[in-house]
Amino acid sequence: MLEVGIVTLLAAGCAGPIKSLYPPRAGEPVRSIYVINHGALHTGLAVKRSDIPPGVWPANRDYAKSKFLEIGWGDDDGYRKPLTVGIAAKALAGSRRTVLLADGFNAVPEKVNSPRFAVIQVDLSDSGFARLCRHIEQTYALDQSGRPIRLGKGWYRARGTYSAFHTCNTWAAEGLRRAGCPITPAYCLTPGPLLSQVRHFGRALRPMESF
């Protein structure tokens, strides 16, 4: 019921678009990205690897044979260990040990045709896409030499604090907002409010249940 209430509130209070960035002007090139929901907790963002500026995302090199790259952000233990009540409570109380996780895939239908995912396509302007890329690039934590901290294939140490008020869904919404989309990240603590906002300016490629 709480999530239903949040969805009702955000319907009346969503931010407008940043008009210099979104929507793309008529005739302007667009960069399609994909908001991919993994169920009750997690949402990530996917892009074409060929659209990613060279050297911007270290994880791009981990999946050199894939056509698409999905990336998400979250609490280290919550991502990399079996989720327990204790781990969830610790993360929601506030965790500075955060990570980025990337995964490669070769065709959007791989996600669309799976009952595990809900997928929404969002078309960005070149400028908006560049700002989204910077949002993700700036989330990578760096070592003392200025290099990304790789924890394994697709895994990287991240910046930012995960909490009940700043989740993986909030992080994804912040990227969309930086790209100019009409979304209010503060409402996007869980997937429902995030997808409810995105579906108003994106195109659902797979029917979503009650978002």
Where on the chain are the PLM-derived regions?
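Bacterial N-terminal signal peptides that target proteins for export
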Residues: 1-4
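C-terminal motif of bacterial Sec signal peptides marking the signal peptidase cleavage site
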Residues: 11-13
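Activation targets extended, charge/polar-rich intrinsically disordered C-terminal tails
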Residues: 16, 138-211
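Residue-level signal for mature regions of secreted extracellular proteins and peptides
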Residues: 7-8
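Non-catalytic ligand/cofactor/substrate-binding and regulatory segments of enzyme domains
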Residues: 19-39, 49-157
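Short beta-strand scaffold segments in enzyme catalytic cores
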Residues: 43-46
